[in-house]
Design a protein with these regions (language model features):
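Short beta-strand element of the alpha/beta-hydrolase
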Residues: 79-87
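N-terminal cap/lid segment of alpha/beta-hydrolase-fold proteins
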Residues: 22-75
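Primarily recognizes the serine-hydrolase "nucleophile elbow" in alpha/beta-hydrolase
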Residues: 134-199, 213
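C-terminal catalytic histidine-bearing segment of alpha/beta-hydrolase fold enzymes
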Residues: 246-295
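Conserved alpha/beta-hydrolase "acid-adjacent" motif
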Residues: 238-244
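Mobile cap/lid helix-loop segments that gate and shape the active-site cleft of serine hydrolases
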Residues: 55, 187-221, 227
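Catalytic nucleophile-loop/oxyanion-hole region of alpha/beta-hydrolase
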Residues: 93-95, 100, 115-150, 275-282
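Short beta-strand/loop motif that positions the catalytic acidic residue
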Residues: 225, 231-233, 237
Length: 295
């Protein structure tokens, strides 16, 4: 009898927890939200069977609906548009940090779109890529109403979002690639000693082959047509080692791609879009200055 009661209590707790997760809504100040496709209407599905939910920190999990959160400045100072790709280890999407970055960009007069992408769910690697490509197309197709130049749509991503930004930069046909890429402490390599293995577990699955690891270690995908790129990171990052950025930067330089890299002495991991980072003003200034160097 006690075992039955205990089981019922566990079930009740699970239902209550799930309901609480579903009840949390994303808090944002976007000027417009566009629901794009979902697992039923997109070219590919991530085969997610659980309900999508958001936790109290603004992290989205089990994502099955692609959404664009559009931030438009009241007084535009740039004709560029930045697709913001939040990180989360490919196990979640840290929307709250993406929103904070977009708010800062809006204050600087730059239009941005925060992408809630569908997660790869242990091996559906094409899903986050096609969502990012869809966001690029949307921005270009709606350039007039967004007040931007369709040839100046770039991407910004941190951590696994940085991998996604490099992913779309290196796996997309040249004519459709982003105009530029901003990589912040990005996951780049799937090497078991150097990379963030959890991200590769979610992206490629736990039974991935060495050939897949090599293909999706994105320093191996750089060519002369890879978009101009800036990398920002901290030297003491113990989540995604700085060697990830170094490998990508080395490949960019090898192929003559316009690129630069800034390494802060401290800060660890996850500081972009998070209050309290010692070098927040510095990375903001460095990024804005770099954007000004682009045509």
């Amino acid at each position: 009898m006690k075992r039955v009661i205990f089981t019922l209590l566990l079930a009740l707790f699970a239902v209550t927890t799930t309901s609480a997760q579903k009840a949390v809504e994303l808090k944002h100040t976007a000027d417009q939200v566009v629901k794009h496709w979902n697992n039923q209407t997109a070219p590919h599905s991530n085969q997610e069977t659980k309900d999508e939910y958001v936790n109290e920190k603004g992290y989205a999990f089990c994502t099955s609906q692609t959404e664009f959160y559009i931030y438009k400045p009241s007084t535009p100072k740039s004709d560029k548009c930045i697709i913001v790709l939040p990180g989360g280890g490919y196990s979640g999407v840290v929307m709250s940090k993406g929103f904070r970055i977009a708010e800062w960009l809006r204050d600087e007069g730059i239009t941005s779109i925060v992408l809630k992408y569908r997660l790869p769910n242990y091996g559906h690697k094409e899903v986050p890529l096609e969502d990012t490509q869809a966001a690029l197309r949307y921005a270009r197709e709606h350039a007039t109403e967004l007040g931007i130049d369709p040839a100046k749509v770039g991407v910004l991503g941190g951590s696994a979002g940085g991998h996604l930004a490099a992913y779309v930069s290196t796996f997309t046909p040249d004519a459709e690639k982003p105009a530029f890429a901003i990589l912040i402490y990005p996951v780049i390599t799937g090497d078991s000693w150097l990379g963030h293995i959890s991200s590769f577990n979610y992206l490629l699955g736990k039974n991935r082959t060495p050939e897949q690891v090599e293909q999706y270690s994105l320093q191996n995908r750089v060519t002369a047509t890879t978009p101009p790129t800036i990398l920002l990171l901290s030297d003491d990052d113990n989540v995604v080692p700085s060697i990830n950025s170094m490998l990508y930067y080395k490949a960019l330089k090898h192929y003559g791609v316009k690129s630069t890299m800034y390494t802060f002495p401290s800060g660890g991991h996850g500081w972009a879009g998070k209050a309290g980072f010692k070098y927040e003003k510095e990375w903001h200034h460095l990024l804005l200055d770099w954007l000004d160097t682009l045509k």
